[in-house]
Amino acid sequence: GVPCLCDSDGPSVRGNTLSGIIWLAGCPSGWHNCKKHGPTIGWCCKQ
């Protein structure tokens, strides 16, 4: 999947670990949405 920035990773992509994965159809079972706002397409989820 495509990595994305969770709210817990920090304010910006620069210098932070991207611990989330973008899912287009919502987070799969056992995962949770880790970003309150965005990304524009899909959900940023993490296990």
Curated annotation (Swiss-Prot):
GO CC terms for this protein? extracellular region; nematocyst
Q: What does this protein do?
A: Binds specifically to voltage-gated sodium channels (Nav) (site 3), thereby delaying their inactivation. Has a strong effect on crustaceans and insects (DmNav1) and a weaker effect on mammals. This toxin is highly potent at mammalian Nav1.1/SCN1A (EC(50)=6.01 nM) and Nav1.2/SCN2A (EC(50)=7.88 nM). It also has great activity on Nav1.5/SCN5A (EC(50)=49.05 nM), Nav1.4/SCN4A (EC(50)=109.49 nM) and Nav1.6/SCN8A (EC(50)=about 180 nM) and is less potent on Nav1.3/SCN3A (EC(50)=759.22 nM) (when measured as the increase in the slow component).
Q: What disulfide bonds does the UniProt entry report for this chain?
A: C4-C44, C6-C34, C27-C45
Any single GO BP term = regulation of signal transduction
**Compartments, record wording:** Secreted; Nematocyst
Alphabetically sorted, this entry's keywords are: Disulfide bond, Ion channel impairing toxin, Nematocyst, Neurotoxin, Secreted, Toxin, Voltage-gated sodium channel impairing toxin
- Chief subcellular site? secreted
One Pfam family, short name please?
Answer: Toxin_4
The name under which this protein is listed is Delta-actitoxin-Avd1c
InterPro entries under this entry? Anenome_toxin (IPR000693), Myo_ane_neurotoxin_sf (IPR023355)
Question: Which Gene Ontology MF annotations are present?
Answer: sodium channel regulator activity; toxin activity
* Family as reported in the entry's similarity comment: Belongs to the sea anemone sodium channel inhibitory toxin family. Type I subfamily.
- Effect upon mutating V2I: In 50% of the molecules
